[in-house]
Amino acid sequence: MTGGLPDAINSFINEGNIFNIRKIQSDIYDYYGDGASKYDKDHKLKIKRIYDLIPSNLEDKKKRVVVKNIENIKGKRFSNYQDEFDFLINSGIALEVKAISTTVFPFIESSGKNLLKLYLNDVGLLSNILYKTNIKAILNDEKASILELFTNQLLQAN
């Protein structure tokens, strides 16, 4: 529910007020999205759009980035957005998982270049976007996106 962001954790420990925690998480989410556009002015709109699509991608059946949804322009390819993906991933704003075609080591050799799944960098941010203050929905998490993000964070941290 709180995720791992220090301000959200401190608010939970000190106040235990879900509304304050969600306000902090909303502010951080907005800060990440706005911050991306300040550092890369040439790509800011596409970066913000990709970032804003992450939660809906996780709730989608395919759960991966669908390039045509970024600008709603047919004919665009994954490579058209490589700089934007790189910015979000390298800045730590988003976590990346690439699809692999075979389970042969090293995995990077069989990764699909155009099959990418992006995650927010904190489970609290996602639970805020999807469920706000509905604790029951968080605990039930029927589509398992919170658990999936938590597992991703755990694997990437170790």
Residue ranges and their predicted role:
Residues 2-158:
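Accessory nucleic acid-recognition modules appended to NTPase machines
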